[in-house]
């Protein structure tokens, strides 16, 4: 047995028992029984079952759930809005300290804000979503401050911090992503699919779980396991691809790696992070690629009736893990209305409000016993305009917020993402008592409390929720984890084209480039655009290599005329799928989502949309047949074509950041080499360009022949698109890739 005290935290390490830790200022005492020590979290002077670490997590959670008031249970069922540490004024996630902004307050960056105190003390919230942090050390100190305050409150229930994915190598066109600080950097989700090696995803999960725990995070809001069978969806890059068998393998590797603590019989322990797989029952089938964050994209459709395949990453992987934890801890339903799926009740409502999808399928047929947590912001009253970025209570807008909460709870939902006020849940309980009886409602609320508490017990937080900030700083972004992440970035890069036309003597293709060349890299120009929150963004110019070209590769020059080679960085086309101007001019507001750069007119779109109907619209047909849209970043294509003209017989290399499949015929023939990457660092790309890494990645997607092929594929069907064949006869289909020697061997399942 070893007793230590550091930074006001007492810790007892017990041979044959659990390590316990408590804060001096919390007032918690220690109980001794049978030669072991236990925390007296309830401050009763006796060892209660939930305080006894010798009992199972299930027994402890059931005991504590039975002791909580309805108000306390309601607090557990909440999930805070996004929290930044520290919350900077002017940012999207603000906070105050004694009524002052952080900069005015003079507080330490790890201080608890007024709003966070209210979450904990008045609303009984114990689940908090962390976004940006100043540093790992600050995150650890902030986590400790939260846990200290929680330990002083009734029952001493610890905080379960969570995070969206935060290890992306760069902000790859995904504004809803959390920002990691000084953390290992990995490819985006579909980049793991491009590795065609589940062990890479498994290594990420193991490393990230260690980093998460060092930051205080015990729940990952991921992985995102939607089968992305619709190529225009804006969240395509975050998924694990569209091929179901690969997605299943990656899902298992990810969840097992995150949740498993080596050496623990049931897998749960100090290195474990709960996974919340999303989005049930699959969010990758939005009609024509529109996204359900917005009411204009609320409908998921299944034109070929392929609904069941989209469940498989959940039902055949996440719910049946190979590791000892057995099953992903939690599931998040998506915002979507899964249109026409509920044949039993005939209701088209948001997934969390669907009795068929949650109660009958998820809880019933597939027997999921973990937490069901809604996506963020679905219970409040809706926005007045269909373009507004507000509540997504699709199909239940005529209910009160409390009635919506009750409907979700009776379906089997345990938690409400982004909700920080317990009042509507308490009111839902009261309505439920009148409808179902007090005994039944109390049992239902306790069931959710038990599920939520089990995940906190799983991670050992009731015994020791405290971090050593100095150790956290050593773990997060350590050399080993950063190396693993960088290797994964390299493995995820796909070489699509490597023409021999301008290849140096002795090489089969133009790549790798010789070092010491003069390199021209044009700036990118992006036109006016819409941000994730539907805010208008002005046109901008950006340098794809703002820190310059490393001298070990060559010299960057100002014009094509001076250069030996042009290196053109582009991103896949992006556009605005909804226009208030079109609506004002008598249209329906809906525009085609284009995957090409030049203006696209939708000549083969559906005449009548599959889904439609919203109380803010006086029509149901969301078709955009005959309408035209243009990518914000059309100038990316101009850069390629202008470089080709100016470079004459000198090579042009294109490096594409691929957030969605792309129409390649606009520029492929003009490029000597094309590299596709899925959210990796520029350094990893330059390794492939200059011979530092012979590429091994394969396309985890299909590249369409043209936009007609995109319109003709089905939103719910994988690998059903006519693919592009390049000027050298290579088919840009799923599994295709090259290395410096030529085309990789054909991929086999």
Predicted segments — roles?
Residues 1-749:
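Glycoside hydrolase catalytic-domain context in secreted enzymes
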